Swiss-Prot record:
Keywords: Chloroplast, Membrane, Photosynthesis, Photosystem I, Plastid, Thylakoid, Transmembrane, Transmembrane helix. It is found in: Plastid, Chloroplast thylakoid membrane. PANTHER family: PHOTOSYSTEM I REACTION CENTER SUBUNIT IX, PTHR36082. It holds the Pfam family PSI_PsaJ. This is Photosystem I reaction center subunit IX. InterPro entries: PSI_PsaJ, PSI_PsaJ_sf. GO terms for biological process: photosynthesis.
Protein backbone atom coordinates (compact mmCIF):
# COMPACT_ATOMS: atom_id res chain seq x y z
CA UNK A 1 0.00 0.00 0.00
CA UNK A 2 2.88 2.36 0.73
CA UNK A 3 4.31 1.72 -2.74
CA UNK A 4 1.01 2.68 -4.35
CA UNK A 5 0.90 5.93 -2.36
CA UNK A 6 4.50 6.66 -3.34
CA UNK A 7 3.71 6.01 -7.01
CA UNK A 8 0.59 8.19 -6.97
CA UNK A 9 2.50 11.09 -5.46
CA UNK A 10 5.15 11.21 -8.20
CA UNK A 11 5.30 14.19 -10.54
CA UNK A 12 4.24 12.51 -13.84
CA UNK A 13 1.16 10.94 -12.25
CA UNK A 14 0.13 14.21 -10.60
CA UNK A 15 0.76 16.11 -13.83
CA UNK A 16 -1.34 13.64 -15.84
CA UNK A 17 -4.20 13.83 -13.34
CA UNK A 18 -4.18 17.62 -13.20
CA UNK A 19 -3.94 17.99 -16.99
CA UNK A 20 -6.72 15.46 -17.46
CA UNK A 21 -8.91 17.36 -15.03
CA UNK A 22 -8.13 20.65 -16.78
CA UNK A 23 -8.88 19.16 -20.20
CA UNK A 24 -12.21 17.79 -18.97
CA UNK A 25 -13.09 21.15 -17.45
CA UNK A 26 -12.32 22.96 -20.71
CA UNK A 27 -14.36 20.42 -22.68
CA UNK A 28 -17.35 20.90 -20.40
CA UNK A 29 -17.06 24.70 -20.55
CA UNK A 30 -16.98 24.53 -24.35
CA UNK A 31 -19.98 22.20 -24.30
CA UNK A 32 -22.12 24.68 -22.37
CA UNK A 33 -20.62 27.89 -23.86
CA UNK A 34 -19.59 27.03 -27.44
CA UNK A 35 -17.22 29.37 -29.29
CA UNK A 36 -16.84 31.68 -26.31
CA UNK A 37 -13.58 33.57 -26.72
CA UNK A 38 -14.62 35.88 -23.88
CA UNK A 39 -17.04 35.15 -21.08
CA UNK A 40 -19.55 38.01 -20.73
CA UNK A 41 -20.60 37.23 -17.16
CA UNK A 42 -20.85 40.90 -16.21
Amino acid sequence: MQDIKTYLSTAPVLAALSLGFLAGLLIEINRFFPDALIFPFF
